[in-house]
Swiss-Prot record:
GO BP, sorted A to Z: L-arginine biosynthetic process
Subunit structure: Homodimer.
Gene3D superfamilies in the cross-refs: 3.30.70.360, Zn peptidases
Binding site for Zn(2+) 1: H78, D110, E167
Protein name from the UniProt record: Acetylornithine deacetylase
Keyword Cytoplasm: yes
Note describing how the cofactor binds: Binds 2 Zn(2+) or Co(2+) ions per subunit.
Keyword terms of this UniProt record: Amino-acid biosynthesis, Arginine biosynthesis, Cobalt, Cytoplasm, Hydrolase, Metal-binding, Zinc
Annotated catalytic residues: D80, E142
Listed GO MF terms: acetylornithine deacetylase activity; metal ion binding
Family: Belongs to the peptidase M20A family. ArgE subfamily.
Location of the protein in the cell: Cytoplasm
Family matches, as HAMAP family: ArgE
Length: 381
């Protein structure tokens, strides 16, 4: 099989749905995309290792390796996309549509298209002249649980010198981002008839106490923690969603609040979760058994790469850009456990998760050149 042309690679990736979602009716296996990548990288001489991701709906990771041993470069990305709103897209999400010097399609920049760039770079390099191994990692479920990246981190099956995650950064290297925590506080009261409010335990009234304590925790985080690389330097706490009760004439028997917390580098998610529980401890003592705090999903740690890293210096030299921090999350905390890691890929983050997601065609040639040089300079002595 001859490797398809760049635009055909792109078309095939976009044509193959790989949506991940916590809603089961929307969740799709990524195996067809994994199989495409396996065939293409195998054609270029890479050895292929495909593994199932535990506790997922038919999801798989792929590691394609050219060379032997540790060291070298890892180019990483996720194969899944977010769901799409059919009413907001003006183009078919699963067709690569060219218009106004742009390629439209779901995953063009977030981030299946990155693999087409990597394949094109590998096609134009004499891989036999590389002195160090080149690995390609394609993961599952980044858009939901990051189960694929977590599985790779747990396996510890290889250790490159450097890793580049090809999320859309307009090819500006990213060296730091905050983490993400989604937490639930559930209040269980005792319902009853509203004509006698004292004859029950009103969960909304207890939640009122909870929000007061959390506002104090907000202030504490701002006063005691800071990372000046970020525009908002402190770990944040946001009230995102609350629901409780079912009727005006009933005492509210249950109420639930969902909050978002963003740890900064140096602050472990476990530490923030402990502070959250400590803030609510007085209410827990006042109302034994009424307050339950739990993760809506497993926390994602913050990430930071040492600015003295040779990888950062190389990325800055190749792109002409200075490394930056960002506020969104990636798989970097899990990849970074084994090597120096940056986030850098084609396309603007402003297009991610948006209707009519697109890649600006003017980015293609510069991006291909940067990725090719990155491979050559990272994998040669």
């Amino acid at each position: 099989m001859q490797l398809p042309k760049f635009n055909e690679l792109y078309k095939s990736l976009i044509l193959t749905p790989s949506i991940s979602s916590l809603e089961k009716e929307l969740d799709i296996s990524n195996k067809p995309v994994i199989d495409l990548l396996a065939a293409w990288f195998s054609e270029l001489g890479f050895s292929i290792n495909i593994t199932s991701v535990p506790e997922t709906n038919g999801k798989f990771n792929l590691v394609a390796t050219y060379g032997q041993g540790d060291g070298g470069l890892l180019l990483a990305g996720h194969t899944d996309t977010v769901p799409f709103d059919d009413g907001l897209w003006t183009k078919d999400p699963f067709q690569l549509t060219e218009k106004d010097d742009k390629w439209y399609g779901l995953g063009t920049i977030d981030m299946k298209g990155f693999f087409a760039f990597v394949l094109e770079a590998c096609k134009n390099i004499d891989l036999t002249k590389l002195d160090k191994p080149l690995r390609i990692l394609a993961t599952a479920d980044e858009e939901t649980t990051m189960a694929g990246a977590r599985a790779i981190a747990a396996a510890k099956s290889f250790r490159p010198d450097y890793a580049v995650i090809g999320e859309p950064t307009s090819m500006v290297p990213v060296f730091m981002h905050k983490g993400h925590m989604s937490e639930a506080i559930r209040i269980t009261g005792r319902s009853g008839h509203s004509s006698d409010p004292a004859n029950g335990i009103n969960a909304i009234e207890i939640m009122h106490q909870v929000t007061g304590q959390l506002l104090q925790l907000q202030r504490k985080l701002k006063e005691q923690y800071a990372c000046d690389h970020f525009v908002i330097p402190q770990p944040t706490l946001n009230f995102g969603h609350v629901h409780g009760g079912d009727s005006p004439n009933r005492i509210c028997g249950s109420c639930e609040l969902h909050i978002d917390m963003r740890p900064i580098p140096g602050v472990n998610p476990d530490e923030l979760f402990m502070l959250l529980n400590q803030a609510l401890l007085p209410i827990m003592k006042q109302w034994p058994g009424a307050v339950d705090v739990y993760h809506l999903h497993e926390p994602i740690p913050a990430y930071a790469c040492d600015t003295d890293s040779a990888l950062i210096k190389l990325a800055e030299k190749l792109t002409g850009e200075t490394v930056i921090p960002v506020n969104y999350c990636t798989e970097a905390p899990f990849i970074h456990t084994g090597c120096d890691t940056i986030v850098m890929g084609p396309g603007s983050i402003n297009q991610a998760h948006q209707p009519d997601e697109y890649l600006d065609l003017s980015a293609i040639k510069p991006t291909q050149a940067i990725i090719q040089k990155l491979i050559e300079q990272s994998c040669k002595n």
